[in-house]
Swiss-Prot record:
Recorded family membership: Belongs to the SIMIBI class G3E GTPase family. UreG subfamily.
Function: Facilitates the functional incorporation of the urease nickel metallocenter. This process requires GTP hydrolysis, probably effectuated by UreG.
Protein name: Urease accessory protein UreG
Gene: ureG
HAMAP family (UniProt xref): UreG (MF_01389)
Compartments reported by the entry: Cytoplasm
Gene Ontology cellular component list: cytoplasm
Organism: Cupriavidus necator (strain ATCC 17699 / DSM 428 / KCTC 22496 / NCIMB 10442 / H16 / Stanier 337) (Ralstonia eutropha)
UniProt keyword GTP-binding present: yes
Length: 209
């Protein structure tokens, strides 16, 4: 028998997107480890042909295994989070049936291009992750992930000297492309910038209200 939710507010659904290798899974791991003592969390990962990101999160101990669900999309990653999000909407329903009092449902998309966005039916807040190793030109290339996401994370800033990228240029371009929309620069693997991301989620998602 399905349990009923006892909390007055619905769970916050946070979509995490970005290109392959940008650090989405690492960000999700770090968020779960930092927030799990204060909030009831579950996570859903997307891969095209495997459940590798689910495995990585489980092995890292981000959350108990039963709180992490892997989805095999079998096709274009952005279709499963935008045009036909039914497979992920079903996954959210299944996780909430198991954990009806979840405060946050994290949904990590499969690696995709700068045009990827989440359906508003699937995600309340969207975080888009790019990385410095992709080149300082990435922010000014635009695309919905850069310009429309609720929060842009420019990750792996520690690699800038090794790839010849100017953090000042990336910051300036991000401001031009995003206007008033916020962005964070850091290296989530080392924890740099993580607190800013968490504060954004708590503030914009009205957690604890």
């Amino acid at each position: 028998m399905t349990q009923a939710r006892t909390k007055k507010n619905p769970p916050l659904r946070v979509g995490v997107g970005g290109p392959v290798g940008s650090g989405k899974t690492t960000l999700l791991e770090m968020l779960c480890k930092a927030m799990r003592d204060r909030y009831d969390l579950v996570a859903i990962t997307n891969d095209i042909y495997t459940k590798e990101d689910q495995r990585l999160l489980t092995v890292s101990g981000a959350l108990p295994a039963e709180r992490i669900m892997g989805v095999e999309t079998g096709g274009c990653p952005h279709t499963a989070i935008r045009e036909d999000a039914s497979i992920n909407l079903e996954a959210v329903d299944r996780m909430l049936a198991r954990f009806p009092d979840a405060d946050v449902v994290f949904i990590e998309s499969g690696g995709d291009n700068l045009a990827a966005t989440f359906s508003p039916e699937l995600s309340d807040l969207t975080i888009y992750v790019i990385d410095v190793a992709g080149g300082e030109k990435i922010p000014r290339k635009g695309g919905p992930g850069i310009t429309k996401s609720d929060l842009l994370v420019i990750n792996k800033t520690d690699l800038a000297p090794y790839v010849g990228a100017s953090l000042e240029v990336m910051e300036s371009d991000a401001r031009k492309m995003r206007g008033a929309r916020p962005f964070v620069m850091g290296s989530v693997k080392s924890g740099q910038g993580l607190d800013e991301v968490i504060r954004f989620i708590e503030r914009q998602g009205m957690l604890g209200v």
